[in-house]
Amino acid sequence: MAFSERTRAARPLSDTTLAYFPDARFAPSDRDRAARVRCTYQCSHTRSWRAVAVSDNDSRYGHIPVMLDRCYELLAPALTADSTDGSGAVLVDATLGAGGHTEHFLTMLPGLTVIGLDRDTNALDIARSRLAPFGTRFVGVHTRYDGLADALDGLGYRTTSSVDGVLFDLGVSSMQLDQAERGFAYSVDAPLDMRMNAQDELTAADILNTYSAVELSRVLSRFGEERFARRIADEIVRRRANEPFTRSGQLVELLYATIPAATRRTGGHPAKRTFQALRIAVNAELESLATAIPAAMAALRPGGRVAVMAYQSLEDKIVKAEFAAATASRSPIDLPVELPGDAPEFTAITRGAERANDEEIEVNPRSAPVRLRAVERVADRRNA
């Protein structure tokens, strides 16, 4: 869709946000800019709109939950199947962060229990403080999302058919971006860390200073889809022979010098793909996701739902493939009837990937690249 004008976003944006989303300061909208700030959500395949106010609590914690109402709409039918207030239902927030999504679910459904997972101890502490008013209805667990099955087992739940909903909000959080010392942002000079869990050993500096040129090139190409991966890798190896990489500024300077000027002018920030690749490698994000999605689907009771928000194509490809396999029939394609036991155990409840609309992007630039997909587990036909 083309827009005839570009207007400024309704609130100031941090340098780190602009570094990851450089177009965020120009959010197209035909709405009245004097109106009170609101978020709206639109399914990319429908014309229905819904508006909600942005919570002051979200602003206080430096993070506005993405597609909040739409996530609730998708998961609520599973959470209220037995009771309208969610009594007896269990939701796993596999990427707890500041707890914005969880707070909304606990507020809307006063009988619901939420298990929140996060690898970042700082985020977990913030969420526990924020969600303390909900008492025992919230349980926080320090683990990556691929530790979902172990977390359930440790809390006394079965690892299969025991929960009613699972929510994933993938990628780096706004809180992490805004903490310069974490090293996620390339707009400020900071230590080359990038660990989401400070207890992990591997850092971005370790990768830059110890991987061979071939290994570096593979990381940049696979996780960053960087066209100039080998050129960058060779230059990293050459420079580190004289001085090890310790600061993000060193790497950004190298990237400006290595990536051709024509690409720098048209391809976005030259550091974007390299920083993404290093972050994914440091935190084993794709490997974790490939384990976590099947575990989440296995944990669902019949009628349970899982919703996943992905922010870049590598994540979305994994989610799309897992959901496609789960919703496909195993019967031969030329048979006129479904064979017993071959019907899919899941059905799609989003038509492809849903997107945030322009008004939400104006208020919350982090929502611009999001892709939201959801599936529901149907009755186990093998036992029917």
Curated annotation (Swiss-Prot):
For the protein in the UniProt heading, the enzyme class is: transferase
User: Does the keyword section mention Transferase?
Assistant: yes
Keyword flag rRNA processing: yes
Q: Which reaction does it catalyse?
A: cytidine(1402) in 16S rRNA + S-adenosyl-L-methionine = N(4)-methylcytidine(1402) in 16S rRNA + S-adenosyl-L-homocysteine + H(+)
EC number(s) per UniProt? 2.1.1.199
What is the recorded function of this protein according to its Swiss-Prot or TrEMBL entry?
Specifically methylates the N4 position of cytidine in position 1402 (C1402) of 16S rRNA.
Name of this protein? Ribosomal RNA small subunit methyltransferase H
